[in-house]
From Swiss-Prot:
Family under the similarity heading: Belongs to the epstein-barr virus LF3 family.
UniProt source species: Epstein-Barr virus (strain B95-8)
Protein name: Uncharacterized protein LF3
Superkingdom assignment: Viruses
Residue span of region Disordered: 1-862
Length: 924
């Protein structure tokens, strides 16, 4: 049976599962500068046709957008392309459609894009493809400068075809537009831009889906339809093309499709603009990625620095779109992050990659989260609009694609130079995908933000950003999905599959592997989707190349991945260069809330990795977004989770808090340990100096969110606090500080609960050890002895605890700079960390430079109390503290927990009341 089933599949799929056609034309797809035929092209794109496949260019063929404007669908300089796309009809109008400067085009156009029509197709622009945002503004759906695009997307409605919709600078557009973004609509559709293709954000602003020189590829991808319209889509330099783009990436769209770029091929975004499917010299990488399909277009996918890449872009990112697809980046491949930076998936050096990974889950869109140095994060924004709103809609922008916040503002989905690309990707989800979210340096980003992260919201959506991919944090900041060189691509990939294509996914110039990445993250994660990062490992797409699970410098993208949950969108959270944590925030908003959503950042994963590196989950110095993440899993994924540059291990964290805790919520910091992400670096489990946030969390967990509680440098405690001991009381709850030790991540280090100068802390530590840390403790800058604590503040304790910054050494991302691990001369810090060390992650955990062992200590399956409220360590567990009834056990390493094998740290909450000192057989 299997075989049989396969058979059919194969046949169609060519066995690959690739489309039979897909590239069908595919072959031709290649992007020869010549443009070779196949679907061929001449110089000029018709490629789409190539892609077209199913349809043929249907309109496709004509579609090409030769500058000449040639034939068929084509155009002339001038866009009408959309029509091209139109397809269903074929150019339906398509043919006539061409957009001659004359403008006659059927659907017509004139200079000015009505292209959307091309794209329109079934959905209509729905596909949003038309949406394009040409600077001209023509784009169909889109706009002129000013986005209304969404409408385009709208679809349901019509304009659906929206064709008319185009937003010519003239502004007529149907859906209209005008300066002002509404683009989201474009995206809207069910599919919406589905193709999203239209979404592209060419600097030109071009086309809805496509591009101009620059591939509109996504559309190409569009496939199902195929570029259907896609084909027409071509992105002539003229830029008119509906789908396509001009130089500029919209590529993401490319990806979009079900197929993937399937057409993918056409997808390419060569600066030349070459052909739809193919590329020119240049890879059209996305397609490459395409993978499932194969690159389907795959082949084309490559990400040439030239920028060709289909998926990718030219300089300019949007590639992500390319990825989108079902397959996910599948095309993913396309994702590549060309140094040019556009890459779809990837990124530039900089982390957001994880997002790529994000997928299914959160940051989903989270992905969008990207943490561009620019900081714009997808979700977020730059100065510019609060795109989020854009995002907001239920779906709307859903496609979000339209959403884009082009500086120009118009592009529907896209952007102008600036990537909103993600949107492209958007599609189904919406930005949800948040994709639209992109954070263009311009900042317009659709959903989000401005400097400041709120991005997460962008993500918000259900999945949202799901596409997240778009999220990318290109330094440019724009790319929607992608990044620039840098991986985030995966998001692009997002899709169902995960990167499934995974392999192809990466499009880093680095060449990172598809799945993997190059040095850089595991784009695959991007793909991950279902799994979450699960893929976890691969997840990261940091150029650093940090391991998947872990991270590299850069955030813990994985979290993004985290999934299921959102960060879901949380993911979106983006890590602003500011680095505010995902959950938390950096200066700027506490997106999390936005994100909060169901899970919280849970997705956390998405939690972008700001250059700052706050880890997604974790954080960087900065708060421990993870909490956001925590949620369900906790970091569960934990391991991979962190992407902190610090490199803390996934599960664990790196220096910096174990964000997870933040997420923890349920548990309170439960994760507690990790909780603080304060630069201080209190250990995750333990905490760092500062109160044991957990306590903070403890209460109800109160802050629970508290977790999110970012670790402000200020360090205000999540739940409680401020540097001031009383907080504990606040927290008090069951235990005093209970978690006491680790909790605080405040640099201040105020004790978690009480703490503060005052000996009590010792208790915290004391129990088992005085100062727990005991002598070494004195990592405290204060240096007062650990045990004694000394009248002093024992602050260190506060800090101490983890101080290790848990991260221990690395932790010291803290500006304070107090030593992380070393803690200062005293070794003890480790203690702080010690507990589990947690590092929880256990040995490996120690991504911490400190590298203290993970939980070597654990011996036996009993937990041995380390002190009151102290840490208990068990076989692989560390109980950071007993909280009244909850025992938070942190497992370091993989242990079998309740029959489940837990990798990385897991937080176990037992409802059994325990006493300090009690031996706790593993009851789980």
């Amino acid at each position: 049976m299997k075989r049989v089933a396969r058979g059919p599949c194969l046949a169609p799929g060519s066995g690959l599962g690739a489309h039979p056609h897909p590239r069908r034309s595919g072959a031709a797809d290649p992007a020869d500068p010549v443009g070779h035929p196949a679907a061929p092209r001449a110089p000029g794109p018709e490629p789409r046709t190539r892609l077209q496949p199913a349809t043929p260019r249907r309109s496709g063929a004509a579609d090409p957008a030769d500058p000449v404007g040639h034939p068929a669908a084509p155009r002339a300089p001038g866009p009408e392309p959309r029509t091209r796309l139109q397809p269903a009809t074929p150019r339906r109008s398509g043919a006539a459609d061409p957009a001659d400067p004359v403008g006659h085009p059927a659907a017509p156009r004139a200079p000015g894009p009505e292209p959307r029509t091309r794209l329109q197709p079934a959905t209509p622009r729905r596909s949003g493809a038309a949406d394009p945002a040409d600077p001209v503004g023509h784009p169909a759906a889109p706009r002129a400068p000013g986005p209304e695009p969404r409408t385009r997307l709208q679809p349901a409605t019509p304009r659906r075809s929206g064709a008319a919709d185009p937003a010519d600078p003239v502004g007529h557009p149907a859906a209209p537009r005008a300066p002002g973004p509404e683009p989201r609509t474009r995206l809207q559709p069910a599919t919406p831009r589905r193709s999203g293709a239209a979404d592209p954000a060419d600097p030109v602003g071009h086309p809805a889906a496509p591009r101009a020189p620059g591939p509109e590829p996504r559309t190409r991808l569009q496939p199902a339809t195929p570029r259907r319209s896609g084909a027409a889509d071509p992105a002539d330099p003229v830029g008119h093309p509906a789908a396509p783009r001009a130089p500029g990436p919209e590529p993401r769209t490319r990806l979009q499709p079900a197929t993937p770029r399937r057409s993918g091929a056409a997808d390419p975004a060569d600066p030349v603009g070459h052909p739809a499917a193919p590329r020119a010299p240049g890879p059209e990488p996305r397609t490459r990625l395409q993978p499932a399909t194969p690159r389907r277009s795959g082949a084309a996918d490559p990400a040439d620095p030239v920028g060709h890449p289909a998926a990718p872009r030219a300089p300019g990112p949007e590639p992500r779109t390319r990825l989108q697809p079902a397959t996910p980046r599948r095309s993913g491949a396309a994702d590549p992050a060309d140094p040019v930076g556009h890459p779809a998936a990837p990124r530039a050096p900089g982390p957001e990659p994880r997002t790529r990974l994000q997928p299914a889950t959160p940051r989903r869109s989270g992905a969008a989260d990207p943490a561009d140095p620019v900081g714009h994060p997808a979700a977020p924004r730059a100065p510019g609009p609060e795109p989020r709103t854009r995002l907001q809609p239920a779906t709307p922008r859903r496609s979000g694609a339209a959403d884009p916040a082009d500086p120009v503002g118009h592009p529907a989905a896209p952007r102008a130079p600036g990537p909103e690309p993600r949107t492209r990707l958007q599609p189904a989800t919406p930005r949800r995908s948040g994709a639209a979210d992109p954070a263009d340096p311009v900042g317009h980003p659709a959903a989000p933000r401005a400097p400041g992260p709120e991005p997460r919201t962008r993500l918000q959506p259900a999945t949202p950003r799901r596409s997240g991919a778009a999220d990318p944090a290109d330094p440019v900041g724009h790319p929607a999905a992608p990044r620039a060189p840098g991986p985030e691509p995966r998001t692009r990939l997002q899709p169902a599959t995960p990167r499934r294509s995974g392999a192809a996914d990466p499009a880093d110039p680095v060449g990172h592997p598809a799945a993997p990445r190059a040095p850089g993250p595991e784009p695959r994660t991007r793909l991950q989707p279902a799994t979450p990062r699960r893929s976890g490992a691969a997840d990261p797409a940091d150029p650093v190349g940090h391991p998947a699970a872990p991270r590299a410098p850069g955030p813990e993208p994985r979290t993004r991945l985290q999934p299921a949950t959102p960060r879901r969108s949380g993911a979106a959270d983006p890590a602003d260069p500011v680095g505010h944590p995902a959950a938390p925030r950096a200066p700027g908003p506490e997106p999390r809330t936005r994100l909060q959503p169901a899970t919280p950042r849970r997705s956390g994963a998405a939690d972008p990795a700001d250059p700052v590196g706050h880890p997604a989950a974790p954080r960087a110095p900065g708060p421990e977004p993870r909490t956001r993440l925590q949620p369900a899993t906790p970091r569960r994924s934990g391991a991979a989770d962190p992407a902190d540059p610090v490199g803390h291990p996934a599960a664990p964290r790196a220096p910096g808090p174990e964000p997870r805790t933040r997420l923890q919520p349920a548990t309170p910091r439960r994760s507690g340990a990790a909780d603080p992400a304060d630069p201080v670096g209190h250990p995750a489990a333990p905490r760092a100096p500062g109160p044991e946030p957990r306590t903070r969390l403890q209460p109800a967990t109160p802050r629970r969110s508290g977790a999110a509680d970012p670790a402000d440098p200020v360090g205000h405690p999540a739940a409680p606090r401020a540097p001031g001991p009383e907080p504990r009381t606040r927290l008090q709850p069951a235990t005093p500080r209970r978690s006491g030790a680790a909790d605080p991540a405040d640099p201040v280090g105020h004790p978690a609960a009480p703490r503060a100068p005052g000996p009590e802390p010792r208790t915290r530590l004391q129990p088992a050890t005085p100062r727990r840390s005991g002598a070494a403790d004195p990592a405290d800058p204060v240096g007062h002895p650990a045990a004694p604590r000394a009248p002093g503040p024992e602050p260190r304790t506060r800090l101490q605890p983890a101080t290790p910054r848990r991260s221990g050494a690395a932790d010291p991302a803290d500006p304070v700079g107090h030593p992380a691990a070393p803690r200062a001369p005293g070794p003890e810090p480790r203690t702080r960390l010690q507990p589990a060390t947690p590092r929880r992650s256990g040995a490996a955990d120690p991504a911490d430079p400190v590298g203290h062992p993970a939980a070597p200590e654990l011996q036996g399956w009993v937990l041995r109390p380390k002190g009151t409220g102290g840490d208990f360590r068990g076989i692989g567990v560390t109980i950071n503290w007993l909280n009244l009834h909850h025992v938070y056990v942190v497992f370091h390493a993989a242990y079998r927990l309740e029959g489940q094998v837990v990798i990385g740290s897991e937080i176990l909450e037992t409802r059994v009341p325990l006493k300090q000192g009690a031996l706790l057989p593993l009851l789980f």
